Amino acid sequence: RDESPAKAKKWTLISNYGDKTLMRNPVAYEVSRRAGMPFTPWCRCVDVILNGEYKGCYQLCDQITVDKNRVNITEMEPEDSEGDALTGGYLVEVDAYAGQETSWFSSSHGIPVTIKSPSDDDITTRQKAYIKRAFNLLERALWSSSFQNDSTGYRSKMDVESFLRHFIVGELAGNTD
């Protein structure tokens, strides 16, 4: 996608309190774009003034959400609860604050995972169970003695290239999440 913002109604203001340079996210997003990540949030530094009072420099960013102009995956419906329909279009986030969300779970290795899409109102019990099972199967494959096996190891459960891109960008940016 080009470097202009997505046409959407939802945006995120990031305070970057822990980044006094105000450069970490813009640099990470640029590295992400250059690494060929399928979605990288657009962002701009903005000065926020509320009721005439200066509040600081923030980053106005695309919100990470399922949308053709953002994370372009199949939008799940409650009817998508069987067969191939059950397997597609989920947006999850590994997040230490997952326990504060409605749709979340802790993986078999204690990793907190928030289900971002489908929304709390739309996700079904079967869809939640599918996501949790898929995540736990990935963990089992990663931690197994045969983790390098092409058919039973982690490669059969994830897109290794996109995971490595995400990991490297996070490391270069000093992302602690």
What are these regions (language model features)?
Residues 1-176:
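Phosphate/dinucleotide-binding and metal-coordinating scaffold of catalytic cores
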